[in-house]
Amino acid sequence: MRFCFDRLCFATKRPAQNSNSNAPHSSTTVDAPPRPADVDVATVPVATPAPPPQQPVSNLFYADYQKLQPAIIDRDWERDRDTDTDTRSEAKPPDIVEHIEPVEEQRQIHTQIQSPAEIQIQIPPTPPAPSIQIQIQQRYRRHSSAEDRNLNTRRNDSNITEALRKAASMQQEPNANYQFPTDLGLVSIVNNNNNTNTHPSGSNSGSNNNSNINNNLVGGIVTLPAAGGLIGLEHTASGLRLIPAPPTHSDVLTHTLIYGTPPSGAQQLNQDPRSLLHQQELQLQQRYQQLQQLQAQTQGLYTSQGSPVLYHQPSPGSSQPVAIPGATCHSPTQLQPPNTLNLQQQMQSLRISGCTPSGTGGSATPSPVGLVDPNFIVSNYVAASPQEERFIQIIQAKELKIQEMQRALQFKDNEIAELKSHLDKFQSVFPFSRGSAAGCAGTGGASGSGAGGSGGSGPGTATGATRKSGQNFQRQRALGISAEPQSESSLLLEHVSFPKYDKDERSRELIKAAILDNDFMKNLDLTQIREIVDCMYPVKYPAKNLIIKEGDVGSIVYVMEDGRVEVSREGKYLSTLSGAKVLGELAILYNCQRTATITAITECNLWAIERQCFQTIMMRTGLIRQAEYSDFLKSVPIFKDLAEDTLIKISDVLEETHYQRGDYIVRQGARGDTFFIISKGKVRVTIKQQDTQEEKFIRMLGKGDFFGEKALQGDDLRTANIICESADGVSCLVIDRETFNQLISNLDEIKHRYDDEGAMERRKINEEFRDINLTDLRVIATLGVGGFGRVELVQTNGDSSRSFALKQMKKSQIVETRQQQHIMSEKEIMGEANCQFIVKLFKTFKDKKYLYMLMESCLGGELWTILRDKGNFDDSTTRFYTACVVEAFDYLHSRNIIYRDLKPENLLLNERGYVKLVDFGFAKKLQTGRKTWTFCGTPEYVAPEVILNRGHDISADYWSLGVLMFELLTGTPPFTGSDPMRTYNIILKGIDAIEFPRNITRNASNLIKKLCRDNPAERLGYQRGGISEIQKHKWFDGFYWWGLQNCTLEPPIKPAVKSVVDTTNFDDYPPDPEGPPPDDVTGWDKDF
């Protein structure tokens, strides 16, 4: 095939295919292009096509300066993927490198291209330059399936670097040749620095003789990575030709790259040859189209030696060329390399060599001028009319103007990046002034402490602000979420009932199938799903009616039985749903705004359930199961003397196992470490006689009976057979010895360092602040803004040596979001706490509009702000801050207080750099061994049992501790989705589904995974050794706990605090745009 243009020729040579698979691999070193003074023009006969339509000479054609990077490519194909034999071409003389016939699908690409007119090219010769040749062979195995063309590759940058280093060391060793195997395959290094090296033809490579240069290249194929794609250069007896290198999908690809000094192509070696060649194929096809257009536009244009006049081709019957009036030729100016030009510039920079038409002789052939580099191919004429010259000047002026505007735009971009760092304070004010955040009502500081995070000294949980753009940190300020508290008394829940609605079997199965198909609700127990199905009531929506409206606060979840609905967001269509689907499931967790609109396309029949009903079902089934399991355990002698909280822990880890009639639950003589309690059905106990093979019946066991208790005490040989007897099967509650030993411990083993040590200091604080009134406080500055109000830095009148954080919360907004109970709990817990890792509360005030909390000021700023600016912390820094949180948890958990809102936003630094826990709006004091069911926390940090409404306790804090470690080490939490529901689904998949970055060490990863176990009883810190098991973990080896507890350990980051009123570590905040809130005189806060 031949692809030719008016002045540029492309021709392919298709050699015969050879079946010799054992032919040796061959390669040829190509001399550098000639010097500009010695020009060789190879003339090829012109095959003139049909004359194109008349084209006006108004286009600008610039010279194409392309840096040549010669590369020889030899392609072999591995025909059989099941053998290691390569099908290669037959060995050729050293001066010839031929292509193997492309496979059919490769050949089709070429046959689709039309053959235009033949053209002529011009190459300035130059003697060879010293070079280092590095050959790297990469092997790919072809799959036999036509549909699967994915090629597996192995890349090893270190081996490439080693090859380049070896090449550099060979600069002074002529004719050196080294080969060695690597993970990439065979690597060859050849030194061609010998200027007297004789080519295969026998000519001296250092000669400037053009014929020698040509002879050396006869039959050779050299690839030139040009702007439009991979171009092949072939020298034949009729002249030099450019050919398109055939697209390759070969299984064996050998790159031989020739480098001068320095070897600048090292980076190119690291490119994946598959993607590079594919890109070059596409560019080459685009190049064909551009050259066809150019050929049509320049058909018949030529000029004579040294003449500034541009001529048409001679008219038929005439031997004289016709001059083009107003068209002149100019020497070109050097352009940028083509690969940096845009498409329009590439079109303008297509190669046009000044030449004569066939038959006019060589006297009129111009010589190139203005060559800057011998490795450049240039033509030295550009056609332009006087009018076009003016356009050129205008375009150049506009390009200069564009460059100036681009510089100004870059400056503005830098300014924008600077201003984005100040957006936190604005985005923290406006969303919460409207009473909602992130689409959730009653969120983002629903605790009331979101207005200062800490108890006052920082922006806290509810700011909703966007983080400053850091290198690796894109997470926005986390928002706290809280549902309205529910009654958690099992006695009250027993008297709560919801109506049940009749359904046919088809509807019941459809609802069940829809729930099990939902990523979130499929995690519910089957007993809970059955009750939910029973309580769902029917609703019907006519066509074109709204089922769910974006922005509304929802409390109902739907299951669609039949019909079709359209889902849209912000007026844009998202999808169409039909069949059994769950709609609006986030509403059953807490009050939240709908994130999309769902409209009935046809009449729709749905089943619905209210959030209150759903949460009651979840709580009641959990409490009933817990009470039932605890009663079972109390009937077992080895459990009857255990504390109530220990029994509840054991009941949480009991797994229900089912057996069919005739199954051997336990076999005599077998080893075992499990203990069983029968919850349903009957089993038969037998013993095998030693003198006979018959089994002797001993007795029957039923519901409430147990067996295998000796396995928990260390005896692992079974002494009897236990066989399922009931026709309906048997259900057993099972616990293994390891889990039992982790949970059972003497209470004396757990040390509580804080029992009464702070009681006296607490009384002293109360006495000191007893006479301070709200009017005695003077506001200095605002430290933070949150969901319920603001946090102000204040001083008492007449005392400038101390400062405090005054947190003020709007009473009306607390009532609106039903967070009264959380606020009272926060005041009670902080008022009793006396721990150096927890912010101290000194006194509380109230009036008709606000509640006030006077607290310790921590002027070092939020840990979240430092993390945002740094991107992430190293291992040592993360260990220090994690240890501070562990100390705070040790104090709280020893008093049965669950925190529930751990995150960097709720950790403040004092003046020394020690971290203090703040914002106790979600904290709660639990009864011994009891759980709580209120959904609250930050979406990225909530534990699975909180999401599934199974009840949670202090074990949820250990989950969030693992999440905090991950975020401090990486800059982002491990569980992050585009919306809360997606985040919850990621959490339910577990920590084992998360890919850990390399910067997290093995010990840190191990601790995170032990803290973030799906089963709360398996989490480190919740087991037998308590929180001391965390302190003893390998990640904390060598950590100076005593120095931390006594504040003698040097913190990794010491904030700059110049005075007691220095607020430079906090943002500036504007005044409240909404003004004072309305009065609240309901009296709910009489004990505040």
UniProtKB/Swiss-Prot annotation:
Residues 1037-1088 form the AGC-kinase C-terminal domain. The modification Phosphothreonine is found at T934, T938. It catalyses: L-seryl-[protein] + ATP = O-phospho-L-seryl-[protein] + ADP + H(+); L-threonyl-[protein] + ATP = O-phospho-L-threonyl-[protein] + ADP + H(+). Residues 777-1036 form the Protein kinase domain. PROSITE patterns: AGC_KINASE_CTER (PS51285), CNMP_BINDING_1 (PS00888), CNMP_BINDING_2 (PS00889), CNMP_BINDING_3 (PS50042), PROTEIN_KINASE_ATP (PS00107), PROTEIN_KINASE_DOM (PS50011), PROTEIN_KINASE_ST (PS00108). The active site is at D901. 3',5'-cyclic GMP 1 binds at G584, E585, L586, A587, R594, T595. One of its GO terms (cellular component) is plasma membrane. GO terms for molecular function: ATP binding; cGMP binding; cGMP-dependent protein kinase activity; protein serine kinase activity. Keywords: ATP-binding, cGMP, cGMP-binding, Kinase, Nucleotide-binding, Phosphoprotein, Serine/threonine-protein kinase, Transferase. SMART domains: cNMP, S_TK_X, S_TKc. Pfam families: cNMP_binding (PF00027), Pkinase (PF00069). ATP binds at L783, G784, V785, G786, G787, F788, G789, R790, V791, K807. Residues 1-69 are annotated as: Dimerization. Belongs to the protein kinase superfamily. AGC Ser/Thr protein kinase family. cGMP subfamily. This is cGMP-dependent protein kinase, isozyme 2 forms cD4/T1/T3A/T3B. It comes from Drosophila melanogaster (Fruit fly).
